[in-house]
């Protein structure tokens, strides 16, 4: 794939890059009494001890660094107290893409470019910045930063280390810029304690949910008057905050939550949702919420995300909402399983719950992901449906988890996105249910031979047996593929040795014949694999158990298969065209060879 105008222009001349760096570690996620702009233990950007080179370097190197910093300061005509923090190789997007360097000073962001004698200088004070967010070059490559300052938008692309540059810019903006926050992060702020009451302000995510407006931008603006406390296991636990404050009616505490079920039945679930997990627990619905979803259960939620490979987990407290019941926000970094681009994608998840008649608890989630292909095309919606189970002597509950991938734009990859999302959700929720049962066994709230995990209407033992059978089939297939690869390798070695012994014209003919042969082999392999597609039947039924939900699932499956067949047909058509072109070229070479012989 060709890179989209991000390569540096040949002949560009830039000033030498600076080498002065500071430790720009982010503020620790701790609910404390210190302001967020100056947390305890965080480095000072203008502290000489953090902006100087390593102590192992001599005085000559230090003076050289200072002289370079002074040279850049004079280039941009900055105040005398400005110190160069770091510089990055990037490009500024205006009418054309200008390759150059970004120089980060304590109070300024500067950019310099010199292409064929055409100089460009840009100076952006941190005090004028109103918005900073990560962006994508051409909407695909996550290597750009967008800055809004003084009513003007600046777009910097082609960063080799975009996250490091964004972190430095973000820290400098929070320390020396305006009070507006960036990047959609749930920031740690000072809890305002007044008369023993912890006051919490709603975030803009809650306002967006109230108005039913999807938050598509990566930037979340919070006013300086808002304070959004965060429950984090890296900092002070939530209990330590509530020990010094009396419980407020506006705060959903872990142990003092007052259940107020609505005197209505839960709304019916849309047919767009697909069941991905089902389980039974031998505890009441209220106890289930307290152990796994309350403010006191954040440690369990964080341990689940860590086991899934997530990092930077943050979670707010439950807050009452007039229209949505109770809401909270969760954010984390999730690993991306692709070979290019970012290794982690930012996930912003809003959660809300309501208790209906007969202890029917419904928890709804809406998750948006950034830094992944087609991230702005879809949103992952989830529903945790928890019902009371009084059939046994001990009151329990039954959990059903449903997922829907809601698309806002059309794409030919919709089927693949939905399939991969559902598969990952099945694995994640199955792991969550296993962890929940282990926690109940540790607390002696469930027997060792108690509730069995059910996934997609299938017992765990049967699912494990089916997985083992699939593994054995996969091993046999891998052995067969290994034999084919070995034979192809030997054939290629023999072919190359034969070509080396031939003349120039014969080499061309032999290579063309080899290409045509490889194309035919590829077509045969693709057609052979197409018949054995990776299809999972998530529901087992007989001819008497077909219901509306099963028919809906079959219709969706047929739609996805139809899309996949269209893509395969397009690919085969292109391969036939390539094959015809190669065949025509081969005949042309044969005619040339005959003419040369005559």
Curated annotation (Swiss-Prot):
Name under which the protein is recorded? Protein VASCULAR ASSOCIATED DEATH 1, chloroplastic
Map out region (Disordered) in residue numbers. 1-64
* Occurrences of domain GRAM (ranges): 70-134
The answer to whether UniProt assigns keyword Coiled coil to this entry is yes
Q: Which keywords label this protein? A: Apoptosis, Chloroplast, Coiled coil, Ethylene signaling pathway, Glycoprotein, Hypersensitive response, Membrane, Plant defense, Plastid, Transit peptide, Transmembrane, Transmembrane helix
State where the transit peptide lies: 1-68
Upon deletion of the gene, what happens? Answer: Lesion mimic mutant with a light conditional appearance of propagative hypersensitive response (HR)-like lesions along the vascular system, and associated with expression of defense genes, production of high levels of salicylic acid (SA). Increased resistance to virulent and avirulent strains of Pseudomonas syringae pv tomato. This necrosis symptoms are ethylene-dependent and associated with ethylene accumulation.
Pfam families to which the protein is assigned, alphabetical: GRAM, VASt
The protein's superkingdom reads Eukaryota
Q: Which GO terms describe its cellular component?
A: chloroplast; endoplasmic reticulum; extracellular region; membrane
Boundaries of each VASt domain copy?
272-444
The UniProt entry lists the main location of this chain as membrane
| Cellular location(s) | Membrane; Plastid, Chloroplast
- Induction pattern: Expressed in response to pathogen infection (e.g. Pseudomonas syringae) at the vicinity of the hypersensitive lesions.
Which lineage is the organism of this entry classified under, starting from the top rank? Answer: Eukaryota, Viridiplantae, Streptophyta, Embryophyta, Tracheophyta
Which parts of the chain span the membrane according to its record? 507-527
Biological source species: Arabidopsis thaliana
